[in-house]
Each structure stands twice: as structure tokens, then as C-alpha cells.
């Protein structure tokens, strides 16, 4: 799944697993789409590349489960995939600024441990210091401070939460202010 391949920060570069060696290339199914990097969420345009026998089997299944995406979505995806670097560069710069800011605010909160993400638009802080699992923590956070987070249980990490920073800087500032208030209340 390479849906976030264009959304990397801090001078990092994305490397496709399929590019690691000819042997790995022959065994890799790459799945991607236009929803994240090109802000086309909901258009349902994706694609896959891999061994021809797997792609043929996928085509067979897909042809019986879904119709083609709308024509405008197909044209939009075609335009996006044929080089719109100048148009997405400001969006990626904004995401990188949000990434830095949310990480800065989050790591200033006592008890929070969080590595700075180098791609996508999520942070995944560890909340183990607060003595409750991520489901209870997330429920209380939304009930008490109206801040939404996805419990890490969904990702096999019960001591973590996932926050999205696909919003404006003002929302990040306010959300992190409320998150800090909540964490501080836990003592």
C-alpha cells in the first residue's frame, strides 16, 4: 500500500518495496490511489501493479463487484497522475508545517511519548503513562474535551492513539490545547 508515497517530510524519500530487488519486484503487489496526495478523497480511484496473474484475478473480481468510477473522476485522476507537482507542492508544505506543529505541541505534554511522523497526516502518541487503554482514553477525550482520536487497538497498539492533522492550523492548536487540558486532568 503506497497511498502516502508522496507525503513524506523532513527530507526523507519514499522507497517502494518493489524497487528493492528483481526477486522482490516479482513477488510484490503495489496498491495506490489518488485520494491522499492529490486531495481526491471520496473519488474512489485506485490502481494496482504486480504479477500479471494476480492482476488478472483482481480484474475478474473487480468486474463483478463494482462499476467504473465516474468519468470526471477518471479524468481528474489522469490529470493528477500525469504531473501536477507545482499544484500539490503547497499542499505538501502545509502538511509538513502541520506535522511539525502538532508534534511540537504533543511532545510538550507531560506523559506523552511521540515520534515525529515522516509521512502521511497522522501522529501516533503513546499514552501508557496515563494508566488506561486507548479505547477508554479516546472515549473520555471525546466526551470531556470533544477531541476525536482513534484508539490504537485498531492498529495493534493498545497504548497509542491516532490523531489526524488533515485540518487547519487553528484546529490543531485548539485540539492540542484541549488534549493537554485532558492529559493534565489525569494527574
Can you say where each PLM-predicted feature lies in the sequence?
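PLP-dependent class I/II
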Residues: 2-187
Amino acid at each position: 500500500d503506497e497511498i502516502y508515497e508522496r507525503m513524506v517530510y523532513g527530507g526523507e524519500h519514499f522507497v517502494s518495496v518493489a524497487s528493492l530487488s528483481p526477486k522482490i519486484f516479482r513477488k510484490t503487489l503495489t496498491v495506490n490511489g489518488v485520494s491522499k496526495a492529490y486531495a481526491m478523497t471520496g473519488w474512489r480511484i485506485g490502481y494496482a501493479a504486480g504479477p500479471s496473474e494476480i492482476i488478472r484475478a483482481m480484474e475478474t473480481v473487480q468486474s463483478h463487484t463494482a462499476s467504473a468510477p465516474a468519468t470526471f473522476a477518471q479524468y481528474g485522476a489522469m490529470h493528477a497522475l500525469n504531473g501536477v507537482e507545482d499544484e500539490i507542492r503547497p499542499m505538501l508544505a502545509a502538511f509538513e508545517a502541520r506535522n511539525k506543529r502538532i508534534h511540537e505541541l504533543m511532545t510538550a505534554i507531560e506523559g506523552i511519548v511521540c515520534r515525529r511522523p515522516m509521512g502521511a497526516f497522522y501522529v501516533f502518541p503513546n499514552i501508557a503513562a496515563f494508566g488506561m487503554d486507548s479505547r477508554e482514553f479516546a472515549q473520555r477525550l471525546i466526551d470531556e474535551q470533544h477531541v476525536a482520536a482513534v484508539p490504537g487497538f485498531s492498529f495493534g497498539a493498545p497504548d497509542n492513539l491516532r490523531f489526524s492533522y488533515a485540518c487547519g492550523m487553528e484546529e490543531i492548536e485548539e485540539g492540542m490545547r484541549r488534549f493537554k487540558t485532558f492529559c493534565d486532568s489525569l494527574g
